């Protein structure tokens, strides 16, 4: 499964939805969307959640568009750790063993690139050499 995200400035005027693709829409800041999700007010899937988390630092849409023009696309090959409700990505110390449900290495001494979904709010960790 692939999830694609596109970045562009919205045109002026009213938003027009395709009834085949969406039933509702609203403009919302990334931080507000994540706060709603943390309080069970908005359902998000992991690719959207991680993307929104990465957008929080931008002061406005123009700054975000400018930064993404310079950035290379990021690809995430996910491995699910069902018993821990987590997704792991390359660079995480447990990425190679995630499929066999091995215990995670000592949290304080490892490289981490994961999304912990065991409780709300979700926590995105990208530390050590996984940066």
List each model region and its residues:
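Active-site segment of metal-dependent pyrophosphate-handling enzymes
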Residues: 1-14, 48-54, 71-77
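A generic structural signal for well-ordered coil/turn residues at beta-strand boundaries
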Residues: 2, 21-24, 76, 83
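NUDIX/MutT-family hydrolases
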Residues: 4-10, 16-42
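Non-transmembrane alpha-helical segments in soluble domains
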Residues: 34, 53-56
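Core RNA-modification/binding signature centered on pseudouridine synthases
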Residues: 55, 60-131
């Amino acid at each position: 499964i692939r999830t694609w995200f596109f970045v562009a400035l919205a045109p002026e005027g009213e938003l027009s939805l395709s009834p085949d693709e969406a039933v509702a829409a609203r403009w919302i800041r990334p931080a507000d969307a994540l706060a709603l999700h943390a309080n069970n007010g908005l359902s998000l899937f992991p690719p959207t959640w991680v993307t929104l988390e990465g957008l929080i630092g931008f002061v406005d849409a123009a700054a975000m568009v400018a930064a993404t023009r310079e950035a290379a696309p990021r690809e995430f090959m996910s491995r699910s750790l069902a018993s821990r409700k987590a997704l792991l990505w390359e660079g995480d110390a447990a990425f190679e063993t995630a499929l066999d449900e091995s215990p995670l290495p000592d949290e304080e001494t490892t490289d981490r690139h994961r999304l912990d979904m065991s409780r709300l709010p979700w926590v995105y960790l990208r530390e050590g050499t996984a940066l």
